[in-house]
């Protein structure tokens, strides 16, 4: 695209990917709120894993419950990694489904047409 003097570059927004483990949920939530208030965050991806690399459902529930509404209040979409059922349960905005996870069709069947 050629730039003209009337060209307005779209603003850059941030995509935050959470660390694979969060030990201090309250401390992390406070830190995340600082980040959300400091910059324009488009979305954040919650991707908590176990030692074997599987999704840590218990930790995802705990952290997701602590941060989802707060992030959404700042205008950030919340994506849950690899788990459409947890995305629905937590009221997330979407789910990240990797190539080696379920198909998009399977994920859509779980989250429904409105997510």
Predicted regions and their residues:
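Flexible, gly/pro- and Lys/Arg-enriched active-site loops
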Residues: 99-105
């Amino acid at each position: 695209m050629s730039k003209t003097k009337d060209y307005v570059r779209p603003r850059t927004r941030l995509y935050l990917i959470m660390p694979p483990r969060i030990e201090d949920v309250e401390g992390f939530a406070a830190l995340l709120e600082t980040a959300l208030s400091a910059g324009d965050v488009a979305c954040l991806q919650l991707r908590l894993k176990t030692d074997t690399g599987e999704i840590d459902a218990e930790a995802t529930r705990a952290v997701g419950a602590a941060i989802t509404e707060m992030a959404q209040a700042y205008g950030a979409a919340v994506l849950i990694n690899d788990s459409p059922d947890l995305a629905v349960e937590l009221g997330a905005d979407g789910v990240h489904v990797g190539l080696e996870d379920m198909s998009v069709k399977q994920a859509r069947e779980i989250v429904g047409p409105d997510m």
